[in-house]
Structures are given as structure tokens and as C-alpha cells.
Amino acid sequence: MHLTEVIKKPVLTEKSFLGHANGVYTFLVDRRANKVQIKKTFEEIFEVKVESVRTMNYDGKEKRMGRFVGKTNNYKKAIITLKDGETLDILSDL
């Protein structure tokens, strides 16, 4: 898997913003990526040192449109904790 395919986008919620002061960032990642790949990709792209990576798999929700039943996509979320003194400047403008 290529480096640019692992990390999809940041999760921009009120709860995820509370962790930014402590060096904790939340990103949506590819479902096939493991913790080692996520850590390596994050350190190479953003040039920071990662302390830990926690991941969660989510199943898509069932959605209905009249009598038709569909489902949203499954996704994986990674909570990335940076080492002390490290910050991520890409989200500081928000």
C-alpha cells in the first residue's frame, strides 16, 4: 500500500479538537492499514515522532430510502498520540 493511500482525512469534531492540546489527533485511515503502517506513514508525511496509534473499525450504518435499504461505507479511525514536544501544524489554523 502506498503512503498516500493510508491516511485519508482528519476527523474534525469537537471531541477530536479537545485532544489537540495534548498532542492527540484523529484521522480516517484505510481499512487495510495496520498500526505499524499508520505510524510509519504519519512520521514520514508530517515529519513528527509518534508515541502510539489506537485504531477502531466501524461498520457502516443502514440507511433507507423508501422501501430500498442501503448501507454507508465501513471505515477505520486512528487516534494518533505524538511524543512530548511534537505538534502538528496542519490543523492549527482551524
UniProtKB/Swiss-Prot annotation:
GO terms for cellular component: ribonucleoprotein complex; ribosome. GO terms for molecular function: rRNA binding; structural constituent of ribosome. Signal peptide: none annotated. Gene3D superfamilies: 3.30.70.330. Pfam families: Ribosomal_L23. Keywords: Ribonucleoprotein, Ribosomal protein, RNA-binding, rRNA-binding. InterPro entries: Nucleotide-bd_a/b_plait_sf, Ribosomal_uL23-like, Ribosomal_uL23/eL15/eS24_sf, Ribosomal_uL23_CS. GO terms for biological process: translation. NCBIfam families: PRK05738.1-3 (NF004359), PRK05738.2-4 (NF004363), PRK05738.3-2 (NF004366). Belongs to the universal ribosomal protein uL23 family. One of the early assembly proteins it binds 23S rRNA. One of the proteins that surrounds the polypeptide exit tunnel on the outside of the ribosome. Forms the main docking site for trigger factor binding to the ribosome. Part of the 50S ribosomal subunit. Contacts protein L29, and trigger factor when it is bound to the ribosome. This is Large ribosomal subunit protein uL23. It comes from Mesoplasma florum (strain ATCC 33453 / NBRC 100688 / NCTC 11704 / L1).
